[in-house]
Amino acid sequence: MIKRFIVFGPPGVGKGTLASLVSQKYGFEHISTGNIFRSQIASNSELGIKLKEIVESGGYVPDSITNEIVKKTLADLEKEQKSYILDGYPRTLNQIEFLFSLNKAQEYSVWFLEAPSEIILKRLSGRRICPSCNAQYHIYFKKSKLDTKCEIDQSELIQRKDDQESSIIKRLEIYEKQTNSLKKYFKELGILVEIDASKDREEILKELEQKVSL
């Protein structure tokens, strides 16, 4: 039987980290719309160029683009009978309605991650990426042994534009406007699981395992 999960919450709350941990432990597919967008941007395709402009300005990718990308990805997984975790999708009522037109709402479990905004700001603004191999570091939690260089290939680490403070604040504002009513909506459907994401990753995973049948 296919298990379908949605990890939901503000930027920087740890959705990707939790989804990766669960995917590795239980063998689920981790579907990150952010990673899909970044691979499109790296390919320098027509869609990638369009996405790059939106992402670097801290803007929001239109539902029409995101929905079609997700639809194609999920169709392949459903065909192969693979369980999956959606990370970064859905984020609007339009996206939710689109997703639940593909599968019934009750076939999903929504993990709602929450943490104070100051913790989110610290987590995001401290991220550093290797532009060559995409290795990730953090100036507070996972410093490179080579200071500002990548341990793997010695490239100078960079901060993504959407991890700069001004972009983070803009993203959080967009999130608040778009998702205030979504938590209530998921709760009314009886598919919401609330998780305290201010703790460390092992404690967050433990809480999830206590609340959700994986």
UniProtKB/Swiss-Prot annotation:
Pfam families: ADK, ADK_lid. Its EC number is 2.7.4.3. The keyword RNA-binding does not apply. One of its GO terms (cellular component) is cytoplasm. It is found in: Cytoplasm. One of its GO terms (biological process) is AMP salvage. AMP binds at residues 33, 38, 59-61, 88-91, 95, 160, 171. Residues 126-163 are annotated as: LID. It comes from the Bacteria. Pathway: Purine metabolism; AMP biosynthesis via salvage pathway; AMP from ADP: step 1/1. It catalyses: AMP + ATP = 2 ADP. The keyword Cytoplasm applies. NCBIfam families: adk. Catalyzes the reversible transfer of the terminal phosphate group between ATP and AMP. Plays an important role in cellular energy homeostasis and in adenine nucleotide metabolism. Consists of three domains, a large central CORE domain and two small peripheral domains, NMPbind and LID, which undergo movements during catalysis. The LID domain closes over the site of phosphoryl transfer upon ATP binding. Assembling and dissambling the active center during each catalytic cycle provides an effective means to prevent ATP hydrolysis. Some bacteria have evolved a zinc-coordinating structure that stabilizes the LID domain. Monomer. HAMAP family: Adenylate_kinase_Adk (MF_00235). This is Adenylate kinase. It comes from Mycoplasmopsis pulmonis (strain UAB CTIP) (Mycoplasma pulmonis).
